[in-house]
Regions:
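Acidic, PIN/NYN-like endoribonuclease modules and their adjacent C-terminal/linker elements
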Residues: 1, 98-129
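Active-site flanking residues adjacent to catalytic metal/cofactor-binding acidic residues
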Residues: 4, 41, 110
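Alpha-helix/helix-capping structural signal
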Residues: 7-8, 38, 112-113
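Active-site-proximal, substrate-binding regions of enzyme catalytic domains
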Residues: 42-70, 83
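Active-site neighborhoods of divalent-metal-dependent phosphate/nucleic-acid chemistry enzymes
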Residues: 19, 68-113
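Residues that scaffold the ATP/ADP-binding catalytic core of kinase and kinase-like folds
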Residues: 11-13, 46, 117
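Short, well-structured N-terminal submotif of metal-dependent ribonuclease cores
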Residues: 1-35, 50-60, 125-129
Length: 129
C-alpha cells in the first residue's frame, strides 16, 4: 500500500498538469492507495480555495475517488458522514472533526454556529462554551 500526499490527489482530480496527472492516475490505478484524513483536509482546502470547487462538486469528486477499488481511506465511514454534512452546509474540517468524535458523549466548542449545525445536521450533542 502506498500513502499519497495532497498534490497527488489534486493532480489526479484537477488534471491541470498533464504529465503529473497521468503519473498520478497510473499510480492510483495500479497500486493500493492509502489516504489519510489530513490529506483529505488539505485536498478539500486546495480544491475549494484555488480551484473554486463547490461543496457538491468537491464531495462528488472525493466520493468518486473513494469508490475506486484501489483507494483506502482512513476512517472511511467517518469521511462519508463528513461529506454528507459538508453538503448540508458544515465546513468540511468541522464535519470531519465531528465525525471523528463519534465515540464522544458531547462535542464542545466556542463556535456557536458549529454547535447549532452539529445539533441540526449531524445530530451531535454539541456543547457551546
Amino acid at each position: 500500500m502506498i500513502a499519497v500526499d495532497t498534490n497527488v490527489l489534486v493532480r489526479f482530480l484537477v488534471r491541470d498538469d498533464a504529465g503529473q496527472a497521468a503519473r498520478a492516475a497510473e499510480l492510483i490505478r495500479s497500486s493500493e492507495i492509502w489516504i489519510s484524513k489530513t490529506v483529505l483536509l488539505e485536498t478539500e482546502w486546495v480544491l475549494r480555495s484555488l480551484y473554486d470547487f463547490t461543496p457538491q462538486r468537491l464531495a462528488g469528486a472525493l466520493r468518486a475517488l473513494a469508490g475506486l477499488g484501489t483507494v483506502f481511506l482512513e476512517d472511511a465511514g467517518g469521511v462519508a458522514k463528513a461529506l454528507n454534512w459538508f453538503e448540508q452546509g458544515l465546513d468540511f474540517a468541522d464535519a470531519l472533526h465531528l465525525a471523528s468524535a463519534a465515540n464522544a458523549k458531547q462535542f464542545a466548542t466556542f463556535d456557536r454556529k458549529l454547535a447549532r449545525q452539529a445539533q441540526l445536521a449531524a445530530k451531535v450533542d454539541a456543547l457551546s462554551l
